Amino acid sequence: LTSDEEIGMLGAQALDTSDITARRLINIDSETEGVLFVSCAGGVRAQCEIELGSRVASSKNVHTVYEITVGGLQGGHSGVEIHKQHANAIKVLGSLLTGIQRECDICVSDITGGGKENAIPKEATAFIAINSDESPAFVKKFREYTAILQQEYKAVEPDIAICLEKKDIAADIYSLEASKNIIYVLGQAIDGVCRMSTQIQGMVETS
C-alpha cells in the first residue's frame, strides 16, 4: 500500500477496492522484518489558490532584479524528523521577505522550493524586483534580517546559507499588491509540530 508513498501514495491509489468489504484496516507496515507498528500516520493534501493577475515585464531603467537563495539546511522526513525543528527553507524565505517588505516594496517574479510532499524543504529560491532607488535600503534590510534568521536557527541549522545576488536582467513580475499576497501566504503557512501526544512521551501527534 505504500508503494511510491514518497510522491503521493500511488500504490494505495491504484488499489482495486471492489472486492474489499471490511471497514477497518490494521496497519502492520514496517521497514524491519518481524517488527510491527502500533500506530499509523496519515496526511491531508491542501491546494491553495489565490488570484494574482498577470505578470508584466520589469524595466531595467526602473527596477533592479535580485535572486535570493536559502540553502545549507538539513531537511529531513516531515513525519519522522519533524520534532527536530529543522528549518523549512520556504518558511525561512517567507520570513525574510515579510521582514524586508515592511521597509521596501517588493515585486515577486518567481518563488520555488521543496521537491517532495513529505520532505522538509531544504532549499528555496526567489526572484524579485526592487525599485532601483530603494536598492541600498533593500540590501541593508536583507543583511539585517539574514543575521536575525541565522541567529534564530544556528542551534539546529549551523550551515544555513541565505544569499543575495544582483541579476542584470529584466523579469516578469507580479503587481505590488499581488506580491504582498504571495509573501503573506508564505509567512502565514503553518509549519512544524502542532501537538505532541499526551499518551506516548516524545511522539508527535499532529504536525
At which residue positions do the language-model features occur?
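Acidic/histidine-rich catalytic neighborhood of metal-dependent amide-processing enzymes
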Residues: 1-56, 109, 201, 205
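Extended amphipathic alpha-helical segments enriched in small hydrophobics
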Residues: 122-131, 135-136
